[in-house]
Each structure stands twice: as structure tokens, then as C-alpha cells.
């Protein structure tokens, strides 16, 4: 709210940035042709450029340009990392490794976002973005020096198999759409709810962000330990279903900080567990082209976030946090039903 604009206006800015994610399927094909190191470094460089634009932006429009560049180029890192895992880790162990990488992501949220919040409270949000640029530059050097630049490993031949998402695999893509729809409902309204209902400032919001980082850390560690044992599809369904009681808790306890936060924590625990469990499945959708399958899944997730960035902010302004909470719970149920149907159809084939 540093630009003194309404939440719905900011929602449109987020929507514009999320549109860049529609390039994920195309980006996935490119990543499958690049070395893992090049795709990851490219993503980090672009993310630093996007954060820089956002930090110096004089208006919401330029801010939207910055976060759009960030969202667009970050895909290269995400897809490159996913392709590296797919090329080096057997499928029956992939849930563990993806869970570990997502644990690192949760630690980044736990520490990085919290530090950015404290920096913002002490200075302003532009300095917070500058700190993010510094972290990205350090990450570039780490990846460049530690990841080899060898060409991609091609596994067994699939010359007769279409190198695209086909058939029942689209159910996995739609599941990611539903999961990200459910998550975005609270991602874009959680902070505003705390500000409006309980008068949270930047420092207290940073503490709340730190707490969410702990929740995501628990979910990622749990996924790395359980997803391969329970099965990817079952784990996705369980996580999606957990969103439902979280949304209901928040809806019923929106005027109580304790009850509301319990609902939020349950909500994000389910979301994070489901999405981490889905990523290893996404890398196997297209034989020999993990980036392509992952790209379609991430693109569907982007579509979900883009749509809900507008819908959720308008629901919040009309009904308070109850509207987004119930909408998110509905999409959690839809995601669980979709992945269960995928599992049932695959079991028959």
C-alpha cells in the first residue's frame, strides 16, 4: 500500500504480473534445450532485474512491470531446477528431493521475507527490494560455481511418444490450477486482513510472514518424508482437503486473531503439502521433457493465481476475509476431486 492505492487496484497489478506465467509451457520447451546451469542463472539474472525495476518504480504501473519481469524470468530458474531433479533422481525418490528443495524455499520465506519486512519497517519497501537483489546476486555466483554446465541427460527413447501433455495428464495440470486458486485467495488478502481487522504494521506483518514460513517449512519437510511412501496422487489429495477446514476456521473466526491464524496455518499447511507433492508428478508427464510437463503445470498455476488476484481482492472488499476463505476452500475440494479422478483412471489403464 506504499502507492496509496486500493487493494483491488493492487490486485490488478498482481494480475498483470501473473499473466507472464502463461509463457511457462513455452519456457519449459526452451529449458529442455538448455543446460541446467544456464537456465537457472538466466532465471536469477532476470529476477534481479525485475526486483530492481520494482524498487525504483514511481507508480503502480512500473511496479507491475518490475514484478512481471520477476515472474517471467523466475520461471527459468524453477524449470531448470525441476529438470535437473528429473534428470538425476529416480521417480520413486523424487518426492523426497523435491521436498528438500521446497524446504529450502520455505527457509527462504522464513528468513528472507521476514528480513525484508523488518527492513521495510525500519526504512521503506524499496530498500527491501534492494536487499532481495543482493540475495539474488549471491545466488547467481553460487549456482554458476557449483552446478556443472554439462548437456542434459537423455533417458530411454520415446520416439513414438508425443512430446507434449496428452490425455489424462491434463487432469494433473487442472489440479495445479485449483491448488493455486485456493492459495491465492489468501496470499493477496492475508496481510490486508491483519491490517484492517487487527491494525498490524510492517513489523507485525513480518512476524506473521515468519510464522507462515514455519508452516511451509513443516509442510515441505513432511512432503519430503511422506510423499514417496503415500504416493504422489494421494498426498496431493490429502493436502488439498486440508485447505477446507482451514478456510472454514478462518471464516468462522475472522474476528478473532488466534482462531483466524489457526485457520490460516492449517490452510497453508495443506496448500504447501499438496503443491510440493505435485511437482515430482509434473516432471514425469512428458517423457524425456521434464521442463515441458513442469512448464504446463506451472502455467496452470499461474492462470489460477492471475484469476484469483482479481477475484479474491474484490471478494475481500465486499465480504471481508470470509469471501476469499470460502472460495479457497471450494477450490481445495475441486483439486482433491480432480487428482483422485486422475489416480482412479490411471489405475484402470
What are these regions (language model features)?
Residues 1-7, 188-203:
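Short amphipathic helix-loop junctions that connect adjacent transmembrane helices
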Residues 24-35, 219-231, 316:
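Helix-to-loop junctions at the C-terminal end of transmembrane segments
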Residues 233-278:
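C-terminal transmembrane helical hairpin of 12-TM major facilitator-type secondary transporters
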Residues 101-144:
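Helix-loop-helix hairpin linking two adjacent transmembrane segments in secondary transporters
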Residues 23-55:
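Conserved MFS/SLC helix-loop-helix module at the cytosolic interface between two early adjacent transmembrane helices
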Residues 68-103:
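Cytoplasmic helix-loop-helix junction between adjacent transmembrane helices
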Residues 290-317:
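A late C-terminal transmembrane helix in Major Facilitator Superfamily
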Residues 15-27, 210-219:
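Central cavity-lining transmembrane alpha-helices of secondary-active solute carriers
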